[in-house]
Swiss-Prot record:
This is UDP-N-acetylmuramate--L-alanine ligase. It comes from Borreliella burgdorferi (strain ATCC 35210 / DSM 4680 / CIP 102532 / B31) (Borrelia burgdorferi). SUPFAM superfamilies: MurCD N-terminal domain, MurD-like peptide ligases, catalytic domain, MurD-like peptide ligases, peptide-binding domain. Pathway: Cell wall biogenesis; peptidoglycan biosynthesis. The lineage of its organism: Bacteria, Pseudomonadati, Spirochaetota, Spirochaetia, Spirochaetales. Its EC number is 6.3.2.8.
Amino acid sequence: MKVDFDDLNNIFFVGIKGSGACSLACFLNSKGYCVEGVDVSDKFYTDEILSNNKISYYDNIYEFSLKQLDRSFDLIVYSSAYNKDGLQVLLEAKELNIPILSYPEALGELSRKYYSIGIAGSHGKTTTTAFLGVLFNKLGLNPNVIVGSSVKDFKDNSAIAGISNIFIVETCEYKKHFLNFSPNMLILTNVDYEHVDFFKNYEALEEAFLQYINNLKKNGILIINSDDNNLLKIKRQINRKDISIFSYGSGDLSDFQISNIAVRSEYFCFSFLGLLNVELKTVLFHNVLNFSAALLALNLFLESNGKSIFDFEEAIKRIAKNYSGIKRRVEVVKEENGVIYMDDYAHHPREIKNTLFGIKNFYKNKRIILDFMPHTFTRTKEFFADFVEVLSAADILILHNIYLSNRENFNPDELSVKLFLNIKKINKNTYFFKDVKDSINFIKSLLISGDLFITMGAGNNFILHDFL
């Protein structure tokens, strides 16, 4: 369905607490649209973002009726977490002939009038989008940005409504959602088998990424991480003579190589694109890759406008050194009584492995206490052995029942306990609490000065920080 956002005024979001839907709602709200929505009453990190943007919403999504509203709407946007034919509010909108778009469809329609830069990949797309958005914004390029989490340098918002024609957007591979998007420039961070409820094998996922590359506008630009073998394989299959392909990475196969990598205090120091001794505030090496992707994209954009990153060298170095991070990405929630409290969104075995390795390497003398909530039954089942291996690396592990997605109807109890028992065989310091809040007193009894406590996963165990 074609929609011209210039003709719209009132927009209603169904599932407004979803990370993408929330970001788009905030973006449109900042652009002057009248935005409202509905979702469940459960607490999500997006509650705070919506509140900060003064966006009102109802919390009874399954019972909600459009009759509760005192005005009509020009467009309904629904989160892809929900079935279009499964909610009363969407069925009512259809009967009333109100245009209905999924979040990725709405994003695609909105992007048509901009010079768009899409960021995708199995891991790191949120951070890379944030890096690129922060760079463009702080260098005065007035971008429009939509990120799947709140960015501290955006005043804890997940979107920026700029005045330029630049549109920087995080795009997702799940259910091929990113195929609604046709960018001028595309950054691919990596490709890893994921979303097993939709992609039946790795080849199906790979084909989706190839389709996305083919969605690039004529004479578009593709940026890939040459440290990722799967992306190198995909690169060999590209049959677009009109697009320009550039690669970044720490290995010799990259067009633009990251070098002189070192850890200094709370910074990774490196050189890239001729910029020497860039100090990036991060504890994880893969963020060096993500920042380098953003730098390369920035430089290519600047060069097309007669400039380069050397015109902004000192400013870029300041941005890297003072980068404040994003919500739920190795986020330091607080430091209290000698304990560091962190939260991270890692929910795939590769993400967990990289994050744990980075934290252990950075905080060498700290005891790592990991509280993990598996997310989705299908992911836990498919990568069961990998989860057992990577989670057992924590000094102390606390597990909870699998957090099911809205699309799943499984009973999570048996698989959750099975995961716990298999890890317990490897790491005796593994504990299981079906419900998150049941673990509060136990965690309090564990923590001593010098510990690092981190909640991890795409579930709701991050609420523990409110009680510790």
